Design a protein with these regions (language model features):
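GHKL/Bergerat-fold ATPase module in large chromosome/replication-associated machines
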Residues: 41, 52-61
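Extracellular/periplasmic, surface-exposed regions of secreted and cell-surface proteins
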Residues: 12-21, 25-31, 35, 40, ...
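Surface-exposed beta-strand-turn/loop segments characteristic
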Residues: 1-3
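Active-site-proximal polar cores
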Residues: 133-134
């Protein structure tokens, strides 16, 4: 009864509401139903890889599952006699967006907005059983390893989970050519919330970003950009980071003095930028202290004249209120070359990367009285 069924739905709708307004709706979803043994495929293949092909038969003539004192697990038994599990997983993704041209204000100007939903959920149930393996001896008796157990009557819930993310962004763009001058600008505001079962509150992100690109006569290119990003992982006053970048390029092959036929394209470029990282692997809200309680069975103290036992508390994590974004600075310079009618391409890059506010795990000595999860910053 091993099977896998998958049901998909997908829809993409694009509509030109007016000459200047475009809207779209994208929908994708799927349902997956799986029936499988209680033994995982990795466990089955691990056993297969350790058993010699001639170590034992699969089963004996009387149907008993074969095994030995050395190989007490049988791949056939793992597949057919450990019970079963049923999994159902669901995925739904929806995105709606609208784009409005504002040529009535100035040519090349436009605004846009997008909302998105991305959700997954899963539910698994199963029943368990077990099997014994038998080793035939010279006197036609069996040595038995393990125990046969019938399929359980009760169905067990193996897992039940869900998570979903809501995202929104809105912004504007400007794209226009004035003779030999090309100008492109873009800016947006964005925010997202990730809701995970068992975690409260949601993971929240918010920020703005933008860029401005200028090109003169398809020879000289410059670009500046920025991101002002925020995360609820850090304390107020440290939640936002500013990450700028600047880049420039000289396309020498478009110069009038460049007439080398062997080289079709030649560009020199350089850039500097900063990138932020807030996914550091620490527990949530590491800027806050974390206290845990314990009762009489695991600690506490006697207080008062009545010798009454009181529960206790201990600090399980030392906070670091100064935690903020990890930032990586990058310097890059390079050259791009195309030869022989673009049949050969050569790219050379040199770069330097430096990370500041590097987030590291801080170890504490035993006399501190806590294992701690304090996060230290380093350059």
């Amino acid at each position: 009864n091993v099977n896998y069924n998958r049901y998909n739905i997908r829809s993409n709708i694009d509509a030109a509401v007016t000459k200047s307004l475009d809207v779209s709706l994208d929908l994708a979803g799927r349902i997956e139903d799986k029936n499988m043994p209680n033994s995982t495929s990795s466990d089955i293949f691990n056993v297969l890889s350790t058993i010699a092909p001639n170590a034992m038969p699969i089963t004996y003539e009387d149907g008993k599952i074969a095994g030995t004192s050395q190989y007490r697990q049988n791949p056939y038994g793992m597949i057919s006699h450990t019970g079963y599990r049923k999994d159902r997983n669901k995925v739904l993704q929806v995105k709606a967006q609208a784009k409005q041209k504002l040529d009535i204000v100035t040519k090349g100007l436009g605004v846009r907005a997008m909302v998105a939903f991305d959700g997954v959920s899963g539910y698994g149930t199963g029943k368990t059983s077990n099997y014994a393996t038998y080793e035939l001896q010279r006197d036609n008796t069996y040595s038995v390893y393990g125990e046969d157990k019938q399929l359980s009557l009760a169905q067990e819930k193996l897992y039940d989970y869900y998570q979903y993310q809501l995202a929104f962004n809105a912004g504007f763009s400007y794209d226009r050519i004035f003779g030999k001058h090309e100008v492109y600008a873009d800016a947006r505001y964005y925010q997202s919330q990730l809701f995970v079962q068992g975690d409260n509150p949601a993971y929240a992100r918010q920020g703005v970003d933008g860029k401005l690109t200028y090109c003169f006569d398809k020879r000289y290119v410059g670009e500046i950009s920025f991101a002002y990003d925020g995360s609820d992982e850090y304390a107020p006053g440290h939640r936002f980071g500013f990450f700028p970048s600047i880049a420039g390029a000289w396309i020498i092959s478009n110069e009038s003095f460049f007439n080398t036929k062997a080289v079709n394209y030649l560009k020199l470029r350089a850039s500097y930028g900063e990138a932020g990282n807030c996914k550091t692997g620490f527990d949530r809200y590491a800027y806050q202290s974390h206290w845990s309680g314990f009762d009489q069975s695991s600690g506490g103290y006697i207080f008062g004249s009545g010798f009454a036992w009181s529960d206790g508390a201990w600090e399980g994590r030392l906070p670091n209120p100064d935690l903020t974004w990890e930032s990586t600075r990058s310097w890059n310079a390079g050259i791009d070359l195309n030869f022989f009618n673009n049949r050969v391409e050569f790219i050379l890059d040199a770069y330097i990367k430096k990370t500041r506010n590097l987030l590291l795990q801080q170890d504490y000595p035993g006399y501190m009285g806590t294992t701690g999860n304090g996060a230290a910053t380093a350059q």
